[in-house]
């Protein structure tokens, strides 16, 4: 990060008892809070050997965050010291009270005594230590103050101490009305475990340079790794505005403001803050100090590059391309190969919407490896794998490519990209219909949630990769009928990624989709229809597809067909093959319901060709089952059984519970249809086998509470029991069928004319 620009003008004003000592080139201010820290350090030196080793260790661990963090109320500071050493907390309070209630000369004498800490052959504090540097900064800042500023500091210290006394008086009154132990426990938890409250930060006055840098680095790290622990967007922006009010040339504050605006998708504010960041970076001369005149060009080209990245993030690809052209021009003039490689990567993102840019990606990966840019090379490999997956490349080749990128990750300790790689493997296995492998990859990533601890003490477990994996995990559980487990995962997602966080849209979409599937299974089409609007807001293609499914279920065939045709054309244009195949299967079902069975066959063959071309095994298996159902309707059940044995295994191994139930129902239908030419004994055996398959289908369908399909299975099973003369079993199935039939609306179509 660039160094902070210091004010070059004298400002005698003082806010909240804070003296602006940086007018003399000092990078720190003297505040009442820092006076309290100085008293703590003084008393710590006096205590010496009286403190045991455990207390001293606790105090040493406490000092660094106290020195680096923002100012805090005296009550909060006192609570923190009491946790480590109660006796020392009392000494600090008494010493501070003597200074605050004494005369001005007492404060003068206190600072004179601090200088003695460095005297002698074996001083109490070394000048180059963390505490020594802090003491020297404070002594120097205090010595540079005028008499009026010293007096203002003294009155501010009195007010600081008085506010603590008032708060203690209020707390004592409250404790008379409440349980003492409960209140103490509550105060310790609230005061010490949680970050500073907004009102405490806002009243602490301007931060020193080191405090500001610590605050910015902490918040930036939290935004990247654990957004829930960072300040809210409004609170953080308020704090940043306060920082910029006292130092408008603080470049890093502008950059954090840019990141904060991205959280709420504010295009104008994020662009404004990004431009201000690079303006201030050039004004401070930080780049030019180390790189000469080249520093200015470096800032300009990276400013254009970051602006292009911002436009890509919001989908403004034309503006992004213009910014990239500017960055490329300046980078070529300066012969900056690193910047050019970053430009090439973003050029791929901006142009992949127009044409296949795999050539650009391959070139970018090769160049990045040549110039020793493992992070960029790995990202390129992962983008290339994603494009190849959508293009239908074999899974083994994609996994080999990801294995090569994983070698780069582990070699260079790129833990963030390791998470992304595992999340990508999960998504690829889901795309290819291998739910078992996807589940294994998801569990692998979840077990690595403590891979790297960042400096603020949080784990890198709130990134986009974890959000993606948890969403897939929730959907996998829902597909297997474990809705309670899926709800728990979604609940955890909501806690980890609140609605205002940048990755919240992921779980919102999956939550809506799971609710939609449950409503459709339960026959509550009006509820499913109400969920379509929410899905459409998050993903227009998914929303349009589910709207067509609802229309089809409500027997609005014409409207559903029009919508599916419109969606089919759009998905073919954007090359969304997965949705194209799903749409073709839905169109074929519309033809079945309309008794146009021969017209459905070419549609299904087209879907089968697509699914095999793009290696979508699960969709291919589902398409074969639909083709088998078409042949059953056309009167060739013997051939259907041969096809089913080929297609049913992938479905039973990796399919959703609903699809397993429908597949077993189809097997039973084919077994019954093929008994026409059987002898009486062989026919009875075939019907018994069909009943067993229907029982298995019932078990699957009951798991997902699919009442419509369950009703059809019960009807079919009752007919078979009637044929076999099993009256008691027939009556039981008939009773269950009647209960479901009264609850659900009838389609008005023959039972045999629906596969799912």
Curated annotation (Swiss-Prot):
Pfam families: ANAPC5 (PF12862), Apc5_N (PF21371). One of its GO terms (cellular component) is cytoplasm. Keywords: Cell cycle, Cell division, Cytoplasm, Cytoskeleton, Mitosis, Nucleus, Phosphoprotein, Repeat, TPR repeat, Ubl conjugation pathway. GO terms for biological process: anaphase-promoting complex-dependent catabolic process; cell division; positive regulation of mitotic metaphase/anaphase transition; protein branched polyubiquitination; protein K11-linked ubiquitination; protein K48-linked ubiquitination. Disulfide bonds: none annotated. Pathway: Protein modification; protein ubiquitination. TPR repeats lie at residues 301-334, 522-555, 581-614, 678-711. It is found in: Nucleus; Cytoplasm, Cytoskeleton, Spindle. The APC/C is composed of at least 12 subunits. This is Anaphase-promoting complex subunit 5. The lineage of its organism: Eukaryota, Metazoa, Chordata, Craniata, Vertebrata.
